[in-house]
Amino acid sequence: MDKRLVSVPYMATVDEAVKQMIQNNVWSLVVERKGAPWGVVTERDVLRRCLVKGLPTSKTSVGTIASSPIVTIGSEATIREAMGKMAANEIRRLFVVEKGKMIGRVTQTELFQSTLDVMEALSSLSSTL
């Protein structure tokens, strides 16, 4: 889980959001509206919902291309539950919530790596038996 949660205001421009992504080395931002988490904007949203459509990034509000609501999962969820939720929602990242507060995000890549790590550990264990 990556605990770096970077946010951007709903009315920020796509240009501003992309700068935030680059400066923070993240590819998704939490979009805030009225001071609360409202949605998520990703690099894919920028490409598909803005650039491909020819919308001006300097004038387009990040809120108009963001996905909402934010898809979350509890901090005690299993890898299987997280992967299932991603598949069901056709998304590549989930935001992790604990006691009603967002504490991080997890990506498909991180879940796949965790699965591989577990499989490798099991393989190593079974070969020593």
Residue map of PLM features:
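Tandem CBS (Bateman) regulatory domains
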Residues: 1-4, 42-72, 78-87, 105-129
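The conserved cystathionine-beta-synthase
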Residues: 7-25, 32, 72-90, 97, ...
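Short acidic/glycine-rich loop or secondary-structure boundary segments that cap or lie
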Residues: 16, 39, 49
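Short hydrophobic/aromatic-rich motifs at helix boundaries and adjacent loops
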Residues: 16-20, 33-35, 53-55, 65
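A glycine-centered beta-loop-beta connector
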Residues: 21-24, 29-45, 86, 94-110
